[in-house]
Amino acid sequence: MSQIKLIVGLANPGAKYEETRHNAGEWLVNELARVFNVTLKEEAKYFGKVAKINTPQGEVRLLVPTTFMNLSGKAVGSLANFYRIKPEEILVAHDELDLLPGVAKIKQGGGHGGHNGLKDIIAALGNSNNFYRVRIGIGHPGHKDLVASYVLGKPSPSDQPLINVAVDEASRCVELLFKEGIVKATNRLNGFKA
């Protein structure tokens, strides 16, 4: 079982997007930064905001790419190459249309499900999809033609608190992962519903 050395929160950059559903991955990394009392700082060579946290498993880097979503692989690839971090040592937090608000799940591998951030990361890691994901449920608008505007919109007043609770629980499960490993963290988070 490899340990996690890099946690990535997928997002689009800028104030215009920070409260949109597509930025749910960033919300998780921001929460981890708050819990570990670190500040994410822009680092141009990694095309993102970066912080280092010390965990029971050793040093872990937090990353929020400052590229647009469809270029997320540039940031992940740069940092992973520099620190020689393998795909299976990476945890990517992202918004998930196929899960309801209030639900978040950890999984390893799989396709990108049309998520442009995941698609670019898979390409940047030499077509490896073997990294872990924290899938943060945002719900589905009901039709594929509505997806683009849906993910770039803000959650409804009823969905936002549910997503927040799921992000908080996901953060606690990442802390559990550092202490007791990915299996325990996965079992706890995958059984959770707000």
UniProtKB/Swiss-Prot annotation:
Name the EC number(s): 3.1.1.29
Q: What is the protein named?
A: Peptidyl-tRNA hydrolase
List, alphabetically, the GO terms of the cellular component aspect: cytoplasm
Where exactly is the site Discriminates between blocked and unblocked aminoacyl-tRNA? N12
Q: How does it assemble?
A: Monomer.
- Whose protein is this, by species? Glaesserella parasuis serovar 5 (strain SH0165) (Haemophilus parasuis)
| Residues at the active site | H22
Looking at the record's lineage, which domain of life comes first? Answer: Bacteria
